[in-house]
Amino acid sequence: MRTRVIVNGANGKMGILACETLENHEQFEVVAKLSRQDNLGQSILDTKAQIVVDLTRADCVYENSLTIINHGARPVIGTSGLVETQINELTKLCEIKQIGGIIAPNFSLGAILMMMLATKASEYFSEVEIIEGHHQQKLDAPSGTALKTAEMIAAARKKPKNKLPLKELTPGARGGSHHDINIHSLRLPGLLARQEVLFGNIGETLSITHNSIDRRCFMPGIVLACQKVLNLTNLVYGLEHLL
């Protein structure tokens, strides 16, 4: 029997590809393709969906996640915009409901490897900044991938970065800061998704860069998440935990 999946945000570019990918996969049945005017909770009940893949917007992803969990389906969240307090609340809710779920800041396997390599490098290089770039239709900044990368680096590095006594002549010139790591966000036509993690040391720099040039690169990660989530009893933050 195929696993019943709802794709929420099915009319977007990612949603269309996700529907096509899951419909052509022998393990899954797409039982509903939802957009903003649809009732997510009622659709879960009507279709008896086991998984909801959420590919919507930053301004509604938290409420969507609550709805999915409270209606007994397993969330596979590919929408950025969740902050740490919200992730913690969703984690607690999954524990109470004993429902597995996945929040994936990035579904690209190459991007996950970039984050893992950056985490390893941070054991040796404490000076690091992140430069992320996306298309101009992405309305939140910094990206979920950049935030997750900063969190992974901060947890792994062995000493704090240097405190520089500089004055910003233009406010924000040094970018934003997350876990004491500067993040610079670009929003330009011609970009899909790009991230560079730039490390510095005396006499050298190390750059780890990943470019997504086609949304199809995210599809293997969506399939992997849907395959793994039914076996989870807790909420997992980051696809790297499933590799």
Curated annotation (Swiss-Prot):
It catalyses: (S)-2,3,4,5-tetrahydrodipicolinate + NAD(+) + H2O = (2S,4S)-4-hydroxy-2,3,4,5-tetrahydrodipicolinate + NADH + H(+); (S)-2,3,4,5-tetrahydrodipicolinate + NADP(+) + H2O = (2S,4S)-4-hydroxy-2,3,4,5-tetrahydrodipicolinate + NADPH + H(+). The active site is at residues 134, 138. (S)-2,3,4,5-tetrahydrodipicolinate binds at residues 135, 144-145. Its main location: cytoplasm. One of its GO terms (biological process) is diaminopimelate biosynthetic process. Coiled coil: none annotated. Pathway: Amino-acid biosynthesis; L-lysine biosynthesis via DAP pathway; (S)-tetrahydrodipicolinate from L-aspartate: step 4/4. It is found in: Cytoplasm. InterPro entries: DapB_C (IPR022663), DapB_N (IPR000846), DapB_N_CS (IPR022664), DHDPR_bac (IPR023940), NAD(P)-bd_dom_sf (IPR036291). It is an enzyme of class 1 (oxidoreductase). It comes from the Bacteria. NAD(+) binds at residues 9-14, 78-80, 104-107. Its EC number is 1.17.1.8. Keywords: Amino-acid biosynthesis, Cytoplasm, Diaminopimelate biosynthesis, Lysine biosynthesis, NAD, NADP, Oxidoreductase. SUPFAM superfamilies: Glyceraldehyde-3-phosphate dehydrogenase-like, C-terminal domain (SSF55347), NAD(P)-binding Rossmann-fold domains (SSF51735). Gene3D superfamilies: Dihydrodipicolinate Reductase, domain 2, NAD(P)-binding Rossmann-like Domain. GO terms for molecular function: 4-hydroxy-tetrahydrodipicolinate reductase; NAD binding; NADP binding; oxidoreductase activity, acting on CH or CH2 groups, NAD or NADP as acceptor. One of its GO terms (cellular component) is cytosol. Catalyzes the conversion of 4-hydroxy-tetrahydrodipicolinate (HTPA) to tetrahydrodipicolinate. Belongs to the DapB family. This is 4-hydroxy-tetrahydrodipicolinate reductase. It comes from Legionella pneumophila (strain Paris). The lineage of its organism: Bacteria, Pseudomonadati, Pseudomonadota, Gammaproteobacteria, Legionellales.
